[in-house]
Amino acid sequence: MIIAAFLLAGATNDPISGTWEGSSLCQVKPSPCHDEHVIYRVKPSAPRHYRIDAYKLVAGHEDFMGAIDVTFDPAAGRLGGAVGKSGRPMGQLRLTLENTRLTGGMTQPDGTLYRLIDVTKR
């Protein structure tokens, strides 16, 4: 019982886990990319590792875009991980934590900034 309470208390202090909402804006135009209102649901998968389930809002409904596994560097306040689809690498996600806000972007494999991301924890 004490261990369960300790684990629950620790989970509430996790600065990364939870629901994040904001914008994901295209930086490469023209491209198939669209500016989006996004919701990220973030859960721990291992110590300092998280899974981001990414959704975009379409006509008021959440449309699942995919999952991204990221690693958190608490000293730097940074999250990062590879982005891919069907086993094909599509680039890197890099976000910086500042209080209840994550900002950063997604780059293509050649390093070109593809999306600017700015989300706030709900």
Language-model features, listed with the residues they occupy:
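Generic short N-terminal amphipathic or hydrophobic helices
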Residues: 1-2, 116
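Bacterial Sec-dependent signal peptides at the C-terminal "C-region" and cleavage site
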Residues: 3-14
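A short, polar/charged loop/turn motif at coil->beta-strand junctions and beta-hairpin connectors
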Residues: 14-16, 46
